[in-house]
Regions:
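Substrate/ligand-engaging "lid" and interaction regions
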Residues: 1-488
């Protein structure tokens, strides 16, 4: 079978220019998803092209991905990233992946032992918020999570990411091996502390001495990741096959823009990521806050309200002047004033984001971005609203964004079509939707403490703002409500 590993590819395809036989699995990565392929793996590949080295990646998937992993093996662990710009596309074959393991194809035991190999220096993760098994209300490990319960009863046969990390570190400690750095690359706030809380929470329940060793010897750098990477579709894979002249089932498309800011706290070394344009810093928090509110907050605003209004893609929203102006106004008038970052031109940042959102080549679906809103709403909108409430400043578009999420998860768009709502809390949400009418819906959903906390549902100004925005959506529909908010 001809694959990208054996085919003669077109001359415009960038191909690894380093000796892949020198790679070792020095990075073990949880979650061979679209974002990782187009971001961390690509940037590590760029380092290898620039300066060489042996920083290979071993990809790990636990509960799915066996088909993808089989396909990756068939093409010598190579895959393609197609960077799609308004002025043309650039195909890049990534060679940084050295091997892959899957619980179904291999075994959980083999996966855990991989973490214990002496050369492993970094364990990185893109497992989404759900994968860390954190209780959103406390920020700590959720002891009631089924996988955590299983792992505490079966510590040497763990099923969760925290359980596997702790078991691997326990074995390294017992064998006298040095620890590794745990690097969350997920687009969640304070991701370094999230994974640290998960790992230490699990370790403390197993052994206080083990927890102390991990706290003293393992580092958990924070990161800020930024690149728009839509999920692969049959259409995107067909386009890439046309570009390459051969199928690549592991390929992914993305925008040209890429940014990665990483706290430079590594206990066992790291690739020279700075040679690939990565920003190494002492504190990632201001960067992360800017990205979550400016980019992700406006992305979610467009996803929920744009979907309700009938826009299938973010670029469709950008062709609608009402949504385009609203996204920019949301960034500059309501999100930017809540940020603590200094030395960054936020006006230029907003203009850049609008241009990125407008890229018609990406076909980034509003429905995809609208997923998992219960996990995204707090950091993308609610934290900024808290700043406005403390200052007694205005936040009409943020209110509309929150109400837009409520309309979206209620399950019907402005044309009366049923919405396929995907969310970790979908059962709780559906119950509250079913038990409330339109007049009660806001209060019913505000009762979800894991989203809104204990403070916001008891803040009269907040509740009034969301009720008013909900009423605008119920009366006028999403597009007209957004237009009215622009002029309020």
């Amino acid at each position: 079978m001809t694959t990208i590993a054996t085919a003669t590819l077109p001359k415009n395809v960038q191909y690894p220019q380093y000796d892949r036989s020198q790679l070792r699995s020095r990075i073990v990565h949880f979650g061979f998803g679209a974002f990782h392929r187009a971001h961390q793996a690509l940037l590590t590949d760029r380092v290898l092209n620039n300066v060489g080295g042996d920083w290979g990646i071993c990809e790990i998937s636990l509960f799915s991905g066996d088909t993808l992993m089989s396909q990756l093996r068939e093409q010598d662990h190579l895959f393609t990233v197609l960077e799609k710009g308004a002025d043309g596309n650039q195909p890049i074959v990534i060679g940084a992946v050295h091997e892959c393991l899957n619980a179904r194809l291999d075994s959980l035991a083999a996966i855990i032992e991989k973490f214990c190999e002496p050369q492993v220096a970094i364990v990185s993760l893109t497992i989404t918020e759900k994968g860390y098994c954190i209780d959103p209300a406390t920020g700590k490990l959720d002891p009631t999570h089924p996988r955590i319960i299983h792992d505490l009863e079966n510590p040497t046969l763990p099923q969760s990411a925290p359980g596997i990390l702790v078991e691997a570190l326990a074995r390294r400690r017992e064998r006298g091996l040095p620890p590794f750095t745990v690097l969350s690359c997920d687009n969640i706030p304070d991701n370094g502390h999230v994974v640290k809380n998960a790992v230490l929470g699990m370790a403390e329940k197993r052994s206080p001495a083990l927890a102390d060793w991990i706290a003293d010897n393992v580092s958990f750098p924070g990161t800020m990741v930024d690149r728009i990477v839509p999920a692969a579709t049959p259409e995107s894979l067909a386009e890439i096959a046309t570009v390459l002249g051969v199928d690549d089932p592991c390929a992914i498309s993305c925008e040209p823009f890429i940014q990665w800011v990483v706290e430079d706290h590594f206990v066992a070394g790291r690739p020279a990521w700075e040679t690939a344009g990565v920003q190494m810093t002492d504190d990632v928090l201001p960067w992360e806050q800017m990205k979550l509110r400016m980019l992700n907050g406006s992305h979610s605003f467009l996803a929920w309200l744009g979907y309700l209004a009938g826009h299938a893609h973010i670029s469709d929203c950008m062709r609608d002047d009402v949504f385009r102006r609203a996204a920019r106004q949301l960034m500059l008038d309501e999100q930017a004033p809540t940020l603590t970052i200094t030395g960054v031109d936020l006006l230029a940042c907003a203009d850049s984001l609008i241009a990125r959102f407008s890229n018609p080549a990406l076909k980034h679906r509003t429905w995809q971005i609208a997923m998992d809103g219960s996990q995204k709403l707090p950091q993308r909108m609610l934290d900024g609203i808290r700043v406005h409430l403390a200052r007694d400043s205005r936040w009409p578009l943020l209110a509309l964004g929150v109400a837009g999420w409520m309309r979206y998860v209620s399950g019907t768009d402005d044309a009366g079509q049923t919405i396929d709502v995907r969310d970790p809390l979908v059962d709780k949400i559906r119950l509250r939707v079913a038990q409330s009418d339109e007049q009660q819906r806001v209060d019913a959903l505000l009762g979800l403490e894991e989203i809104f906390g204990r403070d916001l549902p008891h803040n009269a100004q907040f509740v009034a703002g969301i009720r008013a925005a909900w009423q605008q959506l119920a009366t006028h529909g999403a597009r007209e409500a957004v237009a009215r908010a622009l002029n309020s």
